[in-house]
């Protein structure tokens, strides 16, 4: 009987040891995961004074604080990492790269996204803000992730309305006939400039100033923060407020890199990007008059004009790029 009791006690002790060992291993595994650190490098061609750069600084602070430094964010302005297209490819392949991008570039892969840069798509910034946060745009972003391996953290970085910067005054679309205007190379940009009557020239943003200065191009189109940051007003004195495109940027990462993060960190990146986008939008809107005052103080002429003729001309873009049905979907989201 005594031997039998000793055997039972021994068995209980062995079970207890195994159980404790298993519990110990299960508590240590997540701890090992928590010890991992990740670095995200954000590429952009804009400089350190641009509201979008400042917005990404807010993103950096929020992410690093909420992950206790486990996700580090590094900012690389002025195109020092290379060009957008190459870096988007690196992100697709799993690199720890994020790119400050827009609907024009992403629309090359998911054509529906391109409509976000279509001319005069919405009447107000509030309408556009509603659109970029809608389920419709989230669906397109999901398609981008599934088809091309790029994940949009958020699409709500308003950078301003695009205006023309030229060496001569512009009052109507006819004044732009035949002028060589720098614009990005994606279809929605190119067709918008063509519809107005100008000749689009695709150049990297960093080459725009010398090209305008040397007469390689006759003008450019850009939002005020970018115009001011690049000092384009020094070589293109006349700024015509056509507001033909509202430029909303997005923060894009590679899906492979994103999905290796713990789910908690993935959610933090999305939430902090959305916060940073809203911060950027408010910054651009609140600084608009001050920025225009600085540009005119530097000797430039900013001109308000009747945009109705430009709207009429650019209607052709919607049929050219088969955006008619997409426009109906957009208007449905906006309650129009």
Predicted features along the sequence, with ranges:
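N-terminal secretory/targeting leader peptides
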Residues: 24-126, 136, 145-146, 151-336
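Short, low-complexity disordered leader/linker segments with a strong preference
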Residues: 1-39
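Basic, amphipathic alpha-helical recognition segments used for DNA target recognition
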Residues: 140
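Short beta-strand-centered segments that line the small-molecule binding cleft or hinge
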Residues: 130
